[in-house]
UniProtKB/Swiss-Prot annotation:
Pathway: Carbohydrate biosynthesis; gluconeogenesis
InterPro entries: FBPtase_class3 (IPR009164), Metallo-depent_PP-like (IPR029052)
Family per record: Belongs to the FBPase class 3 family.
UniProt lineage: Bacteria, Pseudomonadati, Bacteroidota, Bacteroidia, Bacteroidales
Gene Ontology terms describing biological process: gluconeogenesis
Cofactor(s) required, per the database record: Mn(2+)
Name of the featured protein: Fructose-1,6-bisphosphatase class 3
Enzyme Commission (EC) number: 3.1.3.11
Organism from which the protein derives: Porphyromonas gingivalis (strain ATCC 33277 / DSM 20709 / CIP 103683 / JCM 12257 / NCTC 11834 / 2561)
Keyword Cell inner membrane tagged: no
Keyword Cytoplasm among record annotations: no
Gene (name only): fbp
Keyword annotations from UniProtKB, A to Z: Carbohydrate metabolism, Hydrolase, Manganese
Reaction equation(s) it catalyzes: beta-D-fructose 1,6-bisphosphate + H2O = beta-D-fructose 6-phosphate + phosphate
Pfam families, sorted: FBPase_2
């Protein structure tokens, strides 16, 4: 045995000072290694739609309903199963409804407690008792463990269980216990959650989603383009901040900004009302759902004015970054100087086009990108709100702690949008700073820049460059989070000809349906074999046009969650989520979610069907997972320590 091995084993012996303790730990770890792997849940492109997100989280993309079916089969009617599932999803709210309609609560409690324990037993069966114990609420841990490990078929045990239930009911703890056991089931059904990008966007509750994630037991995030926009704003990028505010106003979603993060929009509102007092702001009218009665005409007009004001500010701020970074090669996004302020047209490389709006009181034709003093004041005040928002900064910290550009996890490669490619399908070399990078090196360098924007000394050149780069990640042509020739925001506002709105996608989107390309990308990230996959979001799958969520002969899984209601008319569905358990991958297609109220009162669940079921080459055990490989290494080292004790190379220390 080599000296450095002995040095390490000496350290290990401090944790396991006797051969008996080593042997016990080996037995425990090998038992864990031979259990079925935990269930992973993959979601992407939530876009601030918190109600649908929370429901999918609670029902685990149909996993809880499947557990209920497995336990009760034909013993319960469909309506009874729906009622039980609703109770597990929303225990507090459902209990209130039951109390209003059921006078025989003691009988209901007895039946329900029995049903919940059976579902919990099913959810816990693949885990060690130790792991289950850690998921239990401390105040009920002992009693739930007793119930989980008792067999109700035995008459003596059945009486014992009934006596426990009676005690729970008679002491007035039934409601609290039902809530605790329901939330335990939710935790046990999903072992790990992957959010493959875009928590943020136009939906009303990104802050609620982040609050929910921060309380979740195990999760990770692969940053999306909208996440990067908010992260950029939160670290001090004014262009990112202006984009965030513009998008919120474009979709009349002010809840996240004002209620969620305490961003004061009043200075912007006053400025917009004064500056655009006689301007109809027609092209800046917010996009409202047909049934949206939230805003009256006066409010819609004010939002339109604010929308125009921040859009003009955004275009000016973006010019500053483009001017500071010629290496971005984004001069084609500076368009104000191409406007003919005399005849109301704009000259692009593709032709001359009439402008839909020519009222620009804050734009000086001789210096179109200069911010007025008032505009600069608005930027400073808004930026101050973003930087001082305690909740936003806490959420930013969470995004950094749990987030990354990509993740390799249990033979799957997760990233939100793209791996830039050349026309010949090779990995594209992209400039970041002074050097070029491709593939995995590119994503590693990009992540380094993102983290530098957060941790480097304030006002250092390193930090300022990294903060600017976060805006490039939002809309830069070679950004792995965007990967399109250009973002045509200006054209969409001011030019009617839709040909100018086109955003040419990078070659990744052209070639990602080819198996060889996906295998090349997987290999670049160290993954090879029949059970490897790319899990991708970002681009909605248009199911009603025949598009499929699986490509490259099974190597590519597209799970744009379709939570954004704006896309549901074009996709025909509410997107896809993915479940990966010990049997394999289950790609689940969802119908649109109505509301939390309907889910509780009418027991309306999201209609979901498994559209792809890919069985792994063998039932996956813990030892087949990334964590299992680490545990196997621990076992290997413990066996060496046991051998060292046996041969007297290391002396046992009695306690």
């Amino acid at each position: 045995m080599l000296k450095h091995d002995l040095d390490y084993l000496e350290l290990l012996s401090e944790s396991f000072p006797t051969a008996t303790e080593v042997a016990t730990e080996i037995i425990n770890l090998e038992a864990i290694l031979n259990l079925p792997k935990g269930t992973e849940h993959f979601l992407a492109d939530i876009h601030g739609e918190y109600e649908a997100f929370i429901h999918v989280l609670k029902n685990a993309s149909g996993s809880i309903r499947r557990k209920v079916d497995e336990v009760f089969g034909g013993q319960l009617r469909q309506n009874q199963k729906r009622e039980l599932c609703t109770l597990i999803y929303y225990p507090r709210e459902k209990l209130e409804l039951v109390k209003q309609s059921d006078e025989r609560m003691e009988d209901w409690y007895m039946v329900t407690l029995n049903q919940l324990i059976k579902v919990c037993q099913k959810a816990a069966e693949k885990y060690t008792r130790s792991k289950v114990r850690k998921t239990l609420p401390p105040k009920y841990s002992y009693i739930i463990q007793e119930l989980l490990h008792e067999d109700g078929v035995n008459p003596n045990k059945s009486a014992y269980i009934s006596s426990i239930f009676s005690s729970i009911i008679s002491t007035g703890c039934a409601d609290d216990f039902i809530i605790a056991i329901s939330e335990t089931i939710q935790r046990l059904v999903i072992d790990h959650l992957h959010v493959v990008g875009d928590v943020f966007d136009r939906g009303p509750g990104a802050h609620i989603i982040m609050d929910t994630l921060m309380k979740y037991h195990h999760f990770d995030i692969q940053w999306g383009n909208h996440d990067m926009l908010w992260m950029g704003a939160a670290v001090g990028n004014a262009s990112c901040m202006a984009n965030v505010v513009r998008i919120a106003l474009r979709y009349a979603n002010l809840d996240t900004l004002e209620s969620g993060y305490g961003i004061n929009l009043l200075p912007l509102a006053r400025f917009a009302m004064d500056t655009y007092a006689d301007d109809p702001c027609t092209v800046f009218k917010p996009k409202l759902a047909q049934a949206d009665q939230t805003y009256d005409d006066k409010s819609v007009y004010l939002i339109s004015q604010m929308h125009k004001a921040i859009s003009i500010i955004q275009f000016k701020l973006e010019h500053q970054i483009i001017a500071r970074h010629p290496e971005y090669k984004m001069d084609n996004r500076d368009l104000f100087h191409l406007v003919n302020f005399t005849d109301g047209t704009i000259k692009l490389s593709s032709g001359v086009y009439p402008m839909l709006d020519m009222n620009f009181p804050t734009v000086d034709p001789a210096d179109p990108y200069a911010l007025t003093e008032q505009e600069q004041n608005i930027v400073d005040r808004l930026m101050g709100c973003f930087m001082r928002s305690e909740k936003l900064q806490n959420h930013l910290k969470c995004l950094y702690r749990h987030g990354s550009m990509y993740l390799t996890y249990n033979m799957n490669l997760l990233y939100h949008a793209s791996i830039p490619l050349n026309k010949d399908k090779s990995l594209k070399k992209v400039r970041v700073g002074d050097k070029t990078y491709a593939g995995r090196e590119l994503l590693d360098k990009v992540e380094e820049m993102i983290r530098t924007a957060y941790v480097a000394p304030e006002k250092s050149d390193q930090r300022l460059a990294a903060v600017d780069y976060m805006w490039y990640l939002w809309c830069g042509p070679d950004s792995p989070l965007f990967d399109k020739a250009m973002m045509t925001t200006f054209e969409r506002y001011f030019i009617e000809d839709k040909a100018t709105h086109h955003e040419e996608k990078g070659y990744y989107y052209v070639y990602r349906q080819e198996k060889a390309v996906c295998e090349m990308i997987l290999k670049e990230f160290g993954l090879e074999g029949p059970d490897t996959h790319i899990i991708n979001g970002h681009v909605p799958v248009k199911a009603k046009k025949g598009e499929l969520p699986i490509g490259a002969e099974g190597k590519l899984m597209l799970i744009d969650g379709g939570f954004s209601k704006a896309y549901q008319s074009s996709t025909g569905i509410a997107g896809y989520t993915l479940i990966f358990n010990s049997q394999g991958l289950h790609l689940v297609q969802h119908e649109p979610f109505s509301s939390t109220r309907k889910a509780i009162e009418e027991m309306e669940d999201i209609k979901s069907i498994t559209v792809v079921r890919e069985v792994t080459s063998h039932r996956m055990l813990v030892k087949d997972t990334d964590n299992g490989h680490l545990l196997s290494k621990q076992v290997e080292n413990l066996k060496k320590l046991l051998q060292a004790y046996s041969y007297g190379l290391i002396k046992e220390r009695k306690k």
